[in-house]
């Protein structure tokens, strides 16, 4: 099960955070800082899976952004690793070459995409067309 989903830049600034288990608001900042430091401090030759406290971190770097997913110890790491890539491909498809600025200025749309893919910490959809369908409808409604 996915516990949290983060996108952080190379400076360690959180650009997107989504929690699927309750984490006290005061502890979230500390958790995000520790998690981003753990991922940012690793070289590109090191494994993208990290044992961290009572869960695993799976991360992938895309240009200046790191996508980090915290999961319980029973989750399949490779499945989550590919899920991260699928998420970024969906973002690329919608924003045509997604960037950090796209995420910052369209955070609501990024959350809609993530919510279409993950429900209560479980991956429920991976098909790009079905994920983007609600957003495309919203875009058409806002144009008219």
Swiss-Prot record:
Subcellular location: Golgi apparatus, trans-Golgi network membrane
Pfam families: Clat_adaptor_s
Record protein name field: AP-4 complex subunit sigma-1
GO biological process: intracellular protein transport; vesicle-mediated transport
PANTHER family reported in the protein's UniProt record: ADAPTOR COMPLEXES SMALL SUBUNIT FAMILY
Organism of this sequence: Mus musculus
Record keywords, A-Z: Golgi apparatus, Membrane, Protein transport, Transport
Gene transcribed to yield this protein: Ap4s1
Task performed by this protein: Component of the adaptor protein complex 4 (AP-4). Adaptor protein complexes are vesicle coat components involved both in vesicle formation and cargo selection. They control the vesicular transport of proteins in different trafficking pathways. AP-4 forms a non clathrin-associated coat on vesicles departing the trans-Golgi network (TGN) and may be involved in the targeting of proteins from the trans-Golgi network (TGN) to the endosomal-lysosomal system.
CDD domains xrefs: AP4_sigma
Chief location: Golgi
InterPro entries given in the database record: AP_complex_ssu, AP_mu_sigma_su, Longin-like_dom_sf
Similarity section: Belongs to the adaptor complexes small subunit family.
Coiled coil regions, renumbered to chain: none
GO cellular component, one term: trans-Golgi network
Record membrane topology: Peripheral membrane protein
Record's subunit section: Adaptor protein complex 4 (AP-4) is a heterotetramer composed of two large adaptins (epsilon-type subunit AP4E1 and beta-type subunit AP4B1), a medium adaptin (mu-type subunit AP4M1) and a small adaptin (sigma-type AP4S1).
Lineage: Eukaryota, Metazoa, Chordata, Craniata, Vertebrata
